[in-house]
């Protein structure tokens, strides 16, 4: 992933300035204080080793005053495989630009994921699955993540597997409803389910 040259980076937000000045040193501090990430450089600095995966690229039509124009749409997931994940979408006239935009948005959408050992069939107490049954929805797609015992793996479609793997979830059962062939909605439904592990009120 990107390496930020601190001497060249000029933060545009208060959070960015605190990160550059060393007042915020971890991504955990960002979420503990409810800061909103508006600069991808913040993620590059605070989450070293962030990985990315291209989930889908297709052509979409955009209506302009001159008629329809074709654009490439990219869907990308990023994560550190240890409790943080993001999903982004980018549109551009060139594939590379669309991917770059999607990566940038995915970083801005980074969220913490609460992991655990929520299956009654397992008592290892390690953060290999989700801590409880959780749901996420996007468009017509609804995804339910169900805690699974260690060794089960990711029982899910390829798109869901990619997002879950980047989040650091290793064992989970999934149940899906809706048109999962729509990569964007499928990825966002999984992302929203993972988001709910952190923001769910017990």
UniProtKB/Swiss-Prot annotation:
Residues in a coiled coil are: none
Q: Alphabetically list the UniProt keywords.
A: Ribonucleoprotein, Ribosomal protein, RNA-binding, rRNA-binding
Entry note about domains: The N-terminal domain interacts with the head of the 30S subunit; the C-terminal domain interacts with the body and contacts protein S4. The interaction surface between S4 and S5 is involved in control of translational fidelity.
Give GO terms for biological process: translation
Q: Can you name one GO molecular function term for this protein?
A: structural constituent of ribosome
Q: Which family is this protein grouped under?
A: Belongs to the universal ribosomal protein uS5 family.
- What function is annotated for this protein? With S4 and S12 plays an important role in translational accuracy.
Does rRNA-binding count among this protein's keywords?
yes
Which PROSITE patterns does this chain map to? RIBOSOMAL_S5 (PS00585), S5_DSRBD (PS50881)
Q: How does it assemble?
A: Part of the 30S ribosomal subunit. Contacts protein S4.
Q: Which residues form the S5 DRBM domain?
A: 50-113
Q: Which organism is it from?
A: Pyrobaculum arsenaticum (strain DSM 13514 / JCM 11321 / PZ6)
- This one is known as Small ribosomal subunit protein uS5
Gene Ontology CC terms: cytosolic small ribosomal subunit
Please indicate which superkingdom the organism of origin belongs to. Answer: Archaea
Q: Does the keyword Ribosomal protein apply?
A: yes
